[in-house]
Structures are given as structure tokens and as C-alpha cells.
From Swiss-Prot:
Organism: Mycolicibacterium smegmatis (strain ATCC 700084 / mc(2)155)
Superkingdom as given in the UniProt entry: Bacteria
Stretches assigned to the CBS domain: 95-152, 153-211
Catalytic site positions: 302 (thioimidate intermediate)
Protein name per its UniProtKB record: GMP reductase
Length: 478
């Protein structure tokens, strides 16, 4: 990575401050770009879903891992919940999706409550384990909410044995009334569903899998209490990667926590953060972390910078921390501050091996929250920061009322925010398409066949706010 002559920055930069200069390229197609990472996380696209309660759940974990990313489960989850989620994700198919299911006796109201849990647009009606119908929003429109789904389900739908080539499923759906193929096991029971778009994605993305060929998932742990014991429990639960997480990672308790977990020799990549300086990066790697999480205050739900004045513009933080990590054989994840595909590309160009995304994914079908509608009937989901009063209240539920009240006074995050669900990109896979398409194009403009080459070859410039605004498309004439 280098800056254009005369563009060497005299101050720290955000993603908005920077642009990529196109260079000579021998990369013929975006599909020739390898987006897999080399940091040991096992991701085949450089996307990590942040350990936020409003974002990271089992539906998100399954879907993102199937497309090559990885989800970090929040540190507030009990070990039993982590174990159940890990077992669920690792039992999922690498190609077909887990469907929303209903029984024939369920009501239309039940169907409406569940249809938005997945992006498929349909629920499968199951009797004695076998699919007997499909229900969509259109079926439910104008129907009494107490009606039974057996009376409105569509019995004419496409089925195929699980293991059918995705291209064949795509062809089967070409003239189907509903864009959902119901995949069945050899005994005729329901195995999953696959849409036409899902069939296409199966040929583009490579799932992030463990040594046994199962989908990957990560889990977070804090720096308080018996960190080693919890890390051991998370590893035994089946987590593929551990994240030691706190807002201020460059502190003695973090270094002690890293050493405690590293000494267990669990055989898992160890991520720690957050920091924004070379010194902090070096200290965490020397303590035993293999990956350092970079970012203080850039996240959409974070108020740290406005509350404390502490933090650093994210692009410059990633550049400095990535350089320090490379000197020690480590890696960094850019955590927070990405709002467009260009930001992800710039974080990777700066030297990050993966980019953590939180709030951007909160407004999707796969995030854990319920889908809500505003007074204009526009869909949204609620998001909140992990240092907010809402998150702190959940984290301290077992404390005394006095301690809970005292801790509640010290929040650094938004407790409720509406994240709109984009009708054009309602599923997290739609956003992954959006992001990876942008990153692939960036690589072709730079002449990079993979992510290490992107960092090596990229030439950057510094732009004004007007320069950044110029790059925005105009929704109407001027």
C-alpha cells in the first residue's frame, strides 16, 4: 500500500477521506479474485459478524458461514446457549437452507409471525416430518388470522432430493409458481429449501468449514471472572475461534486474559481487542493473540468518542495496527465504521485480513430481533450497542439491584436504534453479494488476484468531503 505522490496524510483518516487509484490489471474477471483470508480464521470471504446481541444469532451464523464468513457469538450468552447454537450451526447443510416450518394446524397468525425469520419468502408445512405444502405472505393476505394453514397452503411446489446439483434446482424453478424448491431426504422427510438465487450462490461462494467439513462459528469471552475456564468451556462446546473482547483492549486485565487463554493451548485462533495503536497491537500479540481487533468508537451504535474523546479515525488505525501486526506474524480485523462496500475494500487495502460488521447486518431477516413496522408500514429491526444501558442491563441481570443501577449510569452506546430493512436487500446474503461484489471489483481495478495482493498493490489518495460526495449516485436529476 502506498499513497499518491503529494498525498501522504498529515493527519488521521476515515474511510470517507480515502480513494483508490485504478492501476494496470491482468485480472480478467471479478470471479477470478480469491477473497479467502490467510489469518487462520477459515473464512473464504473477509467478513466477520460482530458479537452483538442484536445481530449475531444462529440464523445469522448458519447463513453467513455457508457463504464463507463467520459469526462471533456474544460474550453474554450462557455456555448452554452457546453449545446449542454451535451444535445447530454445525449440523446444517452446506448448500440447502434451513426452512421456516409450520404444522397443518398452525394459524395464519403463526405463519405471519414466522415468515420473516428467513429470506426465503415461504414456510414449509410439515406433517409427520414430510413436506405437504408451502405458505407465503401472499397466501396469508386477506385471510382470517385464526384460519389454519392447511386450508391456504399451496400443494403444487417443486421438490428435489437433497444433493441435487444446484444448477439442476435452478432449472427446475425457472417456471415454478414459487421460487422455493423443497429438498427432501432419502426417506421423504424435509431436508431444507433452496431458491434460484441460493442455487447461484452455491456456485460462487465457498462455505467456511472446519476440519470435519462443518460450518464454522466463533464465540466471545470478556476479561472479567475466570476467563480461562470460560474459554475452555467455549472450546469444548465446539467454537472454532475465540475472541477476547473489551472496549479498551490495551490494559493489564486484557493482557492477563490473553496469557491465561493462550496457556491452555486450545489449538484455536485467538482474537483480542480492541486497540487503535501499534503499541497496543504489539502488546496483545506478544501476550499470545494471533489476531488483533482494531477500532475504538467507529461503530454506528457506539458513543465512546462523543462521551470520552477517546478513539481514532478507523482507516489510519487499521493501517498502523496492521503494519505492527505483520512485523510479528499476526493479523488484524477492522472492527466497525463500514457503511458501504468501498469501506470494506479500503479496510482490506489498509491491511486488515477480515472486516467486522455489526449494525449493517442488524436490519436483515436473519438477525435475532423481531421484524417491526413503523407507522408508514416500513419494516425495521431494533439494534443497540454492547456498552449501552440496554446491553449492560442484560449483562448484569444476576447482580444486586444496587449494582445494576450503579452500572447502568455508565453507558457508552445507543440503547435503541431502528435499522431499516431494505426491500431490495432484506437478507444478509443480499448484503454479502453487495459487499463482495464491490471488493472483487476493487481488486480488478487494482490488478489484485487476492487480498494480500490488494494490500501490496493498492495506491491511495486523500480526498476532500466534496470529493467523497461526488462519488455518490444521484437518485434524481439535478
Amino acid at each position: 500500500m502506498r499513497f499518491l505522490d503529494g498525498h501522504t496524510p498529515a493527519y488521521d483518516l476515515t474511510y470517507n477521506d480515502v480513494f483508490v487509484v485504478p492501476g494496470r490489471s491482468d485480472v480478467a474477471s471479478r470471479f477470478d479474485v480469491d477473497l479467502s483470508t490467510v489469518d487462520g480464521s477459515g473464512t473464504t470471504i473477509p467478513v466477520v459478524v460482530a458479537n452483538m446481541t442484536a445481530v449475531a444469532g444462529r440464523r445469522m451464523a448458519e447463513t453467513v458461514a455457508r457463504r464463507g464468513g463467520i459469526v462471533v457469538l456474544p460474550q453474554d450468552l450462557p455456555i448452554t446457549a452457546v453449545s446449542e447454537t454451535v451444535d445447530f450451526v454445525k449440523s446444517r447443510d452446506l448448500v440447502v437452507d434451513t426452512p421456516v416450518t409450520l404444522s397443518p394446524e398452525d394459524s395464519v397468525s403463526d405463519a405471519n409471525a414466522l415468515l420473516h425469520k428467513r429470506a426465503h419468502g415461504a414456510a414449509v408445512v410439515v406433517f409427520e416430518g414430510r413436506p405437504i405444502g408451502l405458505v407465503t405472505e401472499a397466501n396469508c393476505a386477506g385471510v382470517d388470522r385464526f384460519a389454519r394453514v392447511r386450508d391456504i397452503a399451496l400443494s403444487d411446489f417443486v421438490t428435489a432430493p437433497v444433493g441435487t446439483d444446484p444448477r439442476e434446482v435452478f432449472d427446475l424453478l425457472e417456471h415454478a409458481p414459487i421460487d422455493v424448491a423443497v429438498m427432501t431426504a432419502p426417506d421423504g422427510t424435509l431436508a431444507g429449501v433452496l431458491t434460484r438465487t441460493g442455487a447461484i450462490r452455491a456456485g460462487i461462494y465457498t462455505p467456511a468449514v472446519d476440519a470435519k467439513g462443518r460450518l464454522r462459528i466463533a464465540a466471545a469471552v470478556g476479561i472479567n471472572g475466570d476467563v480461562g475456564a470460560k474459554a475452555q468451556a467455549l472450546a469444548e462446546a465446539g467454537a472454532d475461534l475465540l475472541v477476547i473482547d473489551t472496549a479498551h483492549g490495551h490494559q493489564a486485565k486484557m493482557l492477563d486474559a490473553i496469557k491465561a487463554v493462550a496457556s491452555l493451548d486450545l489449538g484455536l485462533p485467538l482474537v483480542a481487542g480492541n486497540v487503535v495503536s501499534a503499541e497496543g497491537t504489539r502488546d496483545l500479540i506478544e501476550a499470545g493473540a494471533s489476531i488483533v481487533k482494531v477500532g475504538v468508537g467507529p461503530g454506528a451504535m457506539c458513543t465512546t468518542r462523543m462521551m470520552t474523546g477517546v478513539g481514532r479515525p478507523q482507516f489510519s488505525a487499521v493501517v498502523e495496527c496492521a503494519a505492527a501486526a505483520r512485523q510479528l506474524g499476526g493479523h488484524v480485523w477492522a472492527d466497525g465504521g463500514v457503511r458501504h462496500p468501498r469501506d470494506v475494500a479500503l479496510a482490506l487495502a489498509a491491511g486488515a485480513s477480515n472486516v467486522m460488521i455489526g449494525s449493517w447486518f442488524a436490519g436483515t431477516y436473519e438477525s435475532p430481533g423481531d421484524l417491526l413496522f413503523d407507522r408508514d408500514d416500513r419494516p425495521y429491526k431494533e439494534s443497540y450497542g454492547m456498552a449501552s444501558k440496554r446491553a449492560v442491563a442484560a449483562r448484569t441481570a444476576g447482580d444486586s439491584s444496587f449494582d445494576r443501577a450503579r452500572k447502568g449510569l455508565f453507558e457508552e452506546g445507543i440503547s435503541t436504534s431502528r435499522m431499516s430493512l431494505d426491500p431490495a436487500r432484506g437478507g444478509v446474503e443480499d448484503l454479502l453479494d453487495h459487499i463482495t461484489s464491490g471488493v472483487r471489483s476493487t481488486c480488478t481495478y487494482v490488478g489484485a488476484a487476492n487480498l494480500p495482493e490488494l494490500h501490496e498493490k493498492v495506491v491511495l489518495g486523500v480526498q476532500s468531503a466534496a470529493g467523497f460526495a461526488e462519488g455518490h449516485p444521484l437518485p434524481a436529476g439535478w
